[in-house]
Every structure is written in structure tokens, then in C-alpha cells.
Amino acid sequence: MGYPGKNHKQYATPKRRFEKTRLEDEKRLIIDYGLRNKRELWKAQSVLRKYRAGARELVALRSGGLSTEDYLKKRDQLVNHLYRYGLVGENADVGDVLALKVEQQLDRRLQTLVLRRGFARSPKQARQFITHGHIAIKGRRVTIPGYRVERAEEAEISYYGPSPLTNEVHPERSRIARAGVR
């Protein structure tokens, strides 16, 4: 058992350092999602790895003789958690959890949702708006680009109240609107 005040590593690095296909895939994802470094990508992969491990454990428990009601309870807990974060559909099963891709996890980051909702022109600008405190969820400022947005919070993303970007005539807002028209 470790000391609770100590920060622990939240990701696992790849086993092979120089694997050409993996490096190319990582580079593409970093550019597409505007990640700062590969550590952010590895964190997303580690989170998915934990979910898939939980799903595999459920399959093993089911074949190992766990009662049906206990299996359904544990499965519903896992699926409801993933549904709340928008990673699976409402009627998902263990197979859907095992089929999760890292892109689905990265799509739920605040940085990606700010870009997709039209608050920024590029992934880098979305990241900048978030870190500079221009973006809020439910009226509360969020300054973490990697914040995992729940399905219920998705509609509540907006510009932060005192931010100059709340003004419709702000020059950057007009640039964002023009970029969205193209």
C-alpha cells in the first residue's frame, strides 16, 4: 500500500519503444486531437485498458459460475458508468466494452468537444481557450483540456461568464464563425 499523498503514474508506456506503425498511429492521433504529448494518449489508453480488463473479468466470472443476478448487477454497473461518460450506447453489452477504441475516449475530452461544438477553430485553440479559463461547464470554469465530459454535461459547455469571448462582437468569435462556415 502506498502513501496516499504521493502521485502515482496513471499510464503505462508501450513495451516496444520504436515500433513504426504504433508511432505513426500515435502521431496521427496527437495531431487530430491536439494532444500536448504522448503521455496524454497513453493515459487514455490506460483508462480503456482498465475498462476492458473489467469486462474480461465479467466474462470470466460468468463462465466461472457467478450467479446470474450478480453478473447482471456488475455488468450494469460497468455499462452504466461507460454510458454516463458517453463511451457506449444505452443498450450496450460486454462485447461493446471490449470493442472500445482510444478514439472514443479521446472524443469525450473537453478539448475535443469544445472544437466539435464550434467554440474554437482548431484543437490547439480549443486547448488554449480551456487553459486560459474561457470555457465553462454548467457555469463553472474548467481549465483542464483532458477533463472527461459526462453525457449530461455535454449540453452545458459554454464560454465562461467574465470571459471576453462571451461578447458576440469579439473579433475571435467572428473568425470562429467564419471558419465554421467553410
Curated annotation (Swiss-Prot):
S4 RNA-binding domain segment(s): 108-172
GO molecular function: rRNA binding; structural constituent of ribosome
Summary of subunit composition and partner proteins: Part of the 30S ribosomal subunit. Contacts protein S5. The interaction surface between S4 and S5 is involved in control of translational fidelity.
UniProt record, GO biological process: ribosomal small subunit biogenesis; translation
Similarity comment: Belongs to the universal ribosomal protein uS4 family.
GO cellular component terms given for this protein: small ribosomal subunit
InterPro entries, sorted: Ribosomal_uS4 (IPR022801), Ribosomal_uS4_arc (IPR022802), Ribosomal_uS4_CS (IPR018079), Ribosomal_uS4_euk/arc (IPR005710), Ribosomal_uS4_N (IPR001912), S4_RNA-bd (IPR002942), S4_RNA-bd_sf (IPR036986)
Record function comment: One of the primary rRNA binding proteins, it binds directly to 16S rRNA where it nucleates assembly of the body of the 30S subunit.
A Pfam family reported for this protein in Swiss-Prot or TrEMBL: S4
Record carries keyword Ribonucleoprotein: yes
UniProt keyword Ribosomal protein present: yes
Keywords, comma-separated and alphabetical: Ribonucleoprotein, Ribosomal protein, RNA-binding, rRNA-binding
Protein name, entry field: Small ribosomal subunit protein uS4
UniProt xrefs under SUPFAM superfamilies: Alpha-L RNA-binding motif (SSF55174)
